[in-house]
Curated annotation (Swiss-Prot):
Organism: Rickettsia akari (strain Hartford)
Name recorded for this polypeptide: Small ribosomal subunit protein uS15
PANTHER family: RIBOSOMAL PROTEIN S15, BACTERIAL AND ORGANELLAR (PTHR23321), SMALL RIBOSOMAL SUBUNIT PROTEIN US15M (PTHR23321:SF26)
InterPro entries: Ribosomal_uS15, Ribosomal_uS15_bac-type, uS15_NS1_RNA-bd_sf
Function: One of the primary rRNA binding proteins, it binds directly to 16S rRNA where it helps nucleate assembly of the platform of the 30S subunit by binding and bridging several RNA helices of the 16S rRNA. Forms an intersubunit bridge (bridge B4) with the 23S rRNA of the 50S subunit in the ribosome.
GO biological process: translation
Length: 91
């Protein structure tokens, strides 16, 4: 259900702005998206896991707030990020 250390490092390397960037909004969105995708796969076989479903909703809300922040500050970065992550636009 959680992501491995190697996968997290790969996401950081892919979405980082600078070499030592581990906490930028784009990196955080990429990691949250990976966790959301993992939980979505988990629910395909564990549909009664309501506690984790609430955790999923918390993660989706956190990602939505980060995407709104990116959209407010840099629209081009936002559009590039959602196309790379394969998610829809935030309303």
């Amino acid at each position: 259900m959680s992501i491995t250390k190697e996968r997290k490092q790969q996401l950081i390397k892919e979405y980082a702005i600078t070499e030592n960037d581990t906490g930028s909004s784009a990196v955080q969105c990429a990691i949250l998206t990976e966790r959301i995708n993992n939980l979505t796969e988990h629910f395909k076989s564990n549909h009664k896991d309501h506690t984790s479903r609430r955790g999923l909703l918390v993660l989706v809300g956190r990602r939505r707030r980060l995407l709104n922040y990116i959209k407010k500050n840099s629209l081009s970065e936002y559009l590039d990020l959602i196309s790379k992550l394969g998610i829809r636009k935030v309303k």
